[in-house]
Amino acid sequence: MSAFQQAQAPARAIDPDSDVEEEALVNDYKEQVQYEEDDAESTQMSLAAQTDDIQSRLAAAAQPLDYSAGLEVKFSSYDSYCSLFHFILNSEGPVDLEPPSYYWAWDVIDEFIYQFNSFSSYRARIARQGNNEEEIAMLRENPNTWGCYSVLNVLYSLIQKSQITEQLAAMKRNEDPAAVAGEYGSKNLYKMLGYFSIIGLLRVHTLLGDFSLALKTLDDIELNKKAMFARVMAAHFTTYYYVGFSYMMMRRYADAIRMFSHILVYVSRTKNFQKNAQYDSITKKNDQMYALIAICVAFQPTRLDDTIHTALREKYGDQLLKLQRGGPEALPIYEELFRTACPKFISPVPPNFDEPEANIDPIEHHLSVFMDEVKTNMFNPTIKSYLRLYTTMDLKKLAGFLEVKPEELRGWLMVNKQRTKQLRWTDGGLLEGELVNVSDLDYALQGDLIHISEAKVGRKLVDWYLRNLSRTYA
């Protein structure tokens, strides 16, 4: 059993929704059941009141917090979530309630992580500024509020309690998931919370910068249209955004483009049927994903779906052209697009309020790592434009064209040669893949002589005509 399930509610002043108050209600109910014959009417009234209270708390957990909410409200919201999850996880036996709606579980996990993310960013900003003594004092007194450990503990506890990973593994083997669900996992409330907690872990680990672990969490979920997350538009979009971004940061650009392309095509084809608030919430993420595709295509030129290609040209046409040219002029474009499209990274530990200058901005840290990769590949387009003109070429001659030292050029060529080999996911876990050559230009160094070969793939016009005819007459 996880530490969260064994832990008690936070030690701050008890509010009406605290764990202690909830346990008192449960104990009162037990005593009334023992004397059911003497006080049946009182028991029914207590049960009805308790059920109404829980239902209202379930509904409230999915409601977004006001963006301008003060620190006390953020603390209170954290306490409310702790109280609710403590009750769901620690009750004697599963809570026999149905979620208010089919997408309620996603809304709860989504809002829970959003508040954790926004609170962490807010706390870090207050620490860096160091001029609000009152809020700094409050944050010092409550270092574990919206802590990374407690949030991860909730998500892992919900997954463990629902046995959702065992259920998903059974489904992959074409077995009955009910056989391994247990008394908690058989309840829709636990099953849905556990399932979307897996998507939540993908998101949290990405925010913390652990991209490999983020992808590892989805080992038991199949990325296809039949998956449970695909039924909720916001969950569908979020999953592919964070998977694609993790692939991009791991330099698996082909897989990143594949993930981004899938969801963007899906959104473009279903936008006329999606009129709810969940669809409206992904509009900004949609533009961010186009920015990420522009970055990935600049690193690894590839043919895109016509719908995506057209939208990309409309949104980022000028920037994409500069990225594809490469050179120092492309650096500020890469930085601008990354800042626009990256998640709001957070630190796993509270900031240092005593030494504000010692706090590192997580976004700046990951931007620095990303820009190191950009600088390594900065001259790729220029180098390739020369190599395409020859079948063999002297290293010193190419260095003269580029106005760099031969040994520096040799280092670039070796690094970029290695970059053309990438893992490409086909099946199994998202970290797995087949090592393939993702470039149409290959070369080998023999001393100072560069041997170049180019594979040109002709456009499949038949497929192009069929796609456009089907869209015209659909």
Curated annotation (Swiss-Prot):
Keyword Protein biosynthesis on entry: yes
Keyword Metal-binding: no
Residue span(s) of domain PCI: 255-449
Single GO BP term: translational initiation
Organism this protein belongs to: Neurospora crassa (strain ATCC 24698 / 74-OR23-1A / CBS 708.71 / DSM 1257 / FGSC 987)
Keywords: Cytoplasm, Initiation factor, Protein biosynthesis
Domain of life: Eukaryota
Principal cellular location given in the protein's record: cytoplasm
InterPro entries associated with the record: eIF3l, PCI_dom
UniProt xrefs under HAMAP family: eIF3l
Role this protein plays: Component of the eukaryotic translation initiation factor 3 (eIF-3) complex, which is involved in protein synthesis of a specialized repertoire of mRNAs and, together with other initiation factors, stimulates binding of mRNA and methionyl-tRNAi to the 40S ribosome. The eIF-3 complex specifically targets and initiates translation of a subset of mRNAs involved in cell proliferation.
Subunit text: Component of the eukaryotic translation initiation factor 3 (eIF-3) complex.
Protein name according to UniProt: Eukaryotic translation initiation factor 3 subunit L
